[in-house]
Amino acid sequence: MQFTILNEPSLDSQRREGDLASENYVFGDIRKEGVRILEDSLRSERNALLAIGAGGAADRVKQHYRKLLDDWEAAIMEIRSNDKYESLCCGFAIEKAEVETEMRNTEELDVYKECLVSECFDKKKRRHIPESSKELLEKAFKVKRFPNSKERERIARECGISPLQVRVWFTNKRARSKSRA
């Protein structure tokens, strides 16, 4: 069996690189880099398939990459010509934010603003532990600084708070007592 290793560009890169010279440098560089990556991927996949004797699959892979390359070039052309996009100096393209424009004259914008004013996006309120519960927690802390889960549940029942609150209280109390020492 004879292996054929392909090193020549298989997607007509000379023609494509000639076209790149007429474009501005940002989009030309983006386009050229995309073409290079796709051609390198195609070359390595085709070589691997040909090495194992799968010539039919290699042809299908080539067609797939040709379609990917055409889609890539179409996307670059759309970005260059479309008013929806701006190019950045570092070579990336972003779509302009049109959310506010789309939301104008709709109730969504009013609801959104009302939600901001009414504190819909505030974090959860702190759970307050009553003074009587704090006394019980202090007593339990003096007895044992690291209660296990069963002890935390018992303390939580006695205090009328959740076991999670008990666990957090003990963690915070240990940290406070450590920093004071």
UniProtKB/Swiss-Prot annotation:
Single GO MF descriptor: DNA binding
UniProtKB keywords: DNA-binding, Homeobox, Nucleus, Transcription, Transcription regulation
Name of a matching Pfam family: Homeodomain
UniProt-annotated location(s): Nucleus
Record-annotated DNA-binding residue ranges: 122-181
Note: In P.angusta, all mating-type proteins (MATA1, MATALPHA1 and MATALPHA2) are encoded on one idiomorph, consistent with the fact that P.angusta is a homothallic haploid in which any strain can mate with any other strain.
Similarity remark: Belongs to the MATA1 family.
Function (record text): Mating type proteins are sequence specific DNA-binding proteins that act as master switches in yeast differentiation by controlling gene expression in a cell type-specific fashion.
Name of the protein described by the UniProt record: Mating-type protein A1
Highest classification ranks of the organism: Eukaryota, Fungi, Dikarya, Ascomycota, Saccharomycotina
